[in-house]
Design a protein with these regions (language model features):
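Short, T/G/N/S-enriched strand-turn elements that build extracellular solenoid repeat scaffolds
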Residues: 53-58, 72-82, 367-368
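Acidic, glycine- and Ser/Thr-rich low-complexity intrinsically disordered tracts
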Residues: 18-23, 39-40, 46, 62, ...
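Structural detector of coil-to-beta-strand junctions
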Residues: 73, 106-107, 115, 129-131, ...
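Right-handed parallel beta-helix
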Residues: 67, 87, 93-97, 114-125, ...
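Right-handed parallel beta-helix/beta-solenoid
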Residues: 12-14, 18-54, 68-70, 94-96, ...
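Extracellular beta-strand solenoids
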Residues: 33, 66, 76, 92, ...
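Right-handed parallel beta-helix/beta-spiral solenoid domain characteristic of secreted/periplasmic
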Residues: 35-37, 46-48, 65-68, 73, ...
Length: 467
């Protein structure tokens, strides 16, 4: 097998620049792909490949430089994998627009690959933009080192913008990165704009911009059966690996996420406003920090949609939500945690601190949960401060809420003295989105261009409501 692989890796060297052999034994070089290339191309600048997947399979561990133009669907398999010291890098050429138009289906699909970086692509249309998937065929070895960077996905009509489905219950996807991507104008149905689902251990979702989609912005999911053990695996909890865990969701901007107009969420002739900007749905041990979420149905939510009556693992823990700014979320709440019905799984052992919540109708919604800490948050405006789900038993709503600060809440009865001081004038606590209260509110401030856009969007929403 090594001899055959080496033969394939030597193919197409031509006059490619920068050829070297790394510790993995792979030959690293720069390989060119262009719509103007031919089937007989050798991957050199003078004679490029015409097929991205062909280039990646022929030269794993190399840099695949993709030149501008329009391409069809791309399918990358395990043969495109690089090594730990030499990942396969598939990158749009500097200053050139590489557009993937799938004409239905998935724009870019990656299956059971590892140590692969996808960078600088634009996907327009189709049912999925970029999809990375692991399956049991990958065996018992974790798949690590996959990164999706600086890609743009828009015009999806069907399911996901960017999705990672780790279906292999035998071994996790590890060291996963989604960074610097833009996902917008997507009709997701009952799915999500950017989602991680299944057996994923160790990830980064950082510096992405997600906007104008009709369902959840960023979702980290567990317990849907994506990586459930098959019936042949006995004596173990079938869901023990079926959840996203140990990751970071940081420095993302998410706005304009709403189910308004989404026919998957029609109830009694009305659209149910339930799309989160950022959602942990069954994920565990995740840090959510320094994100700006505005004008969504729900800002940030931490919960599970499954019942512990069905499996004791169906609960959420180890989530820390801190130093985020959440504004103008008027569908349901700015910050929400806990199972939305009395039988659904607990959110427990989580911490929500140093967030700034501005003019969300309900600032904090508490649902089935216990032993969480909600402190050092700054609450500005809004109809209600803290609202409890009345369908839940009182003993399922026991959390510690203290040391916060609030101003301008219209329903003053929704704010108890033990939550923290309530001021009549918000100008004493904040200058715009910047906190003036010592050790309360987000210590991180969004960039001025984003705060200005937020103000404009909130004004538009206010005018729309008046009409």
């Amino acid at each position: 097998m090594r001899t055959d692989a080496a033969s394939r890796r030597n193919h197409g060297s031509g006059d490619a620049a920068g050829t070297s052999v790394n510790e993995s034994g792979m030959i690293h070089k720069t390989v060119h792909v262009s719509p103007a290339g031919g089937a007989a191309g050798d991957g050199s600048a003078a004679s490029p490949f015409d097929d991205i997947a062909k280039a990646a399979a022929a030269c794993p561990g190399s840099t695949i430089l993709v030149h501008g133009g329009v391409y069809g669907r791309i399918a990358l398999g395990p043969e495109a994998s690089g090594g730990a010291d030499s990942p396969t890098v598939i990158r749009a050429a500097e200053g050139e627009r590489v557009l993937i138009r799938p004409d239905g289906g998935t724009g870019i699909r990656i299956l059971n690959a590892h140590h692969l970086i996808l960078e600088g692509f634009e996907v327009e249309g189709g049912t999925h933009g970029i999809r990375y998937e692991s399956t049991r065929e990958a065996g018992n070895t974790p798949l690590g080192g996959v990164a999706i960077r600086n890609c743009t996905v828009h015009g999806i009509r069907g399911v996901h913008g960017i999705c990672v489905y780790a279906r292999n219950d035998r071994a996790p996807v590890t060291d996963l990165t989604v960074e610097g991507c833009r996902v917008y104008d997507c009709e997701c149905g009952s799915s999500e704009s950017l989602v991680l689902n299944g057996n994923i251990e160790g990830f980064r979702i950082v510096s992405n911009v997600i906007f104008g989609n009709n369902n959840i912005g960023i979702d980290m999911i567990g317990f849907e059966g994506t990586a459930k053990h098959p019936g042949s695996v006995r004596g173990r909890n079938p869901y023990e690996a079926d959840f996203v865990r140990r990751g970071v969701c940081r420095n993302n901007v998410v706005w304009g996420i709403s189910t308004e107009g989404n026919m998957a969420y029609v109830s009694d002739g009305h659209f149910d406003p339930c799309a989160d900007g950022i959602y942990v749905d069954g994920g565990q041990d995740i840090e959510i920090a320094e994100n700006f979420v505005f004008c969504c149905d729900i800002g940030i939510e931490v919960a599970t949609e499954h019942s512990p009556d069905d499996n004791p693992l169906f609960r959420v823990s180890g989530i820390r939500v801190h130093d985020n700014v959440i504004a103008g979320c008027r569908g349901f709440a700015g910050l929400c945690f806990g199972g939305y019905a009395r039988h659904l799984g607990y959110t427990e052992g989580c911490e929500f601190d140093h967030n700034t919540l501005v003019d969300n109708d309900t600032q904090i919604a508490v649902q089935r949960s216990r032993d969480n800490r909600i402190h050092r948050n700054l609450i500005l405006g809004g109809e209600s401060g803290v609202v409890f789900n009345e369908s839940c038993r009182p003993e399922d709503l026991v959390n510690r809420i203290d040391a916060n600060a609030a101003a301008g809440i219209r329903d003053r009865e929704s704010w108890r003295a033990e939550y923290g001081p309530l001021s009549p004038d918000r100008a004493t606590l904040a200058d715009g989105f910047r906190t003036l209260a010592p050790d309360v509110g987000s210590r991180w401030i969004p960039a001025p261009e984003w705060t200005e856009l937020c103000r404009e969007q909130m004004k538009r929403e206010s005018v729309k409501e008046q009409l």
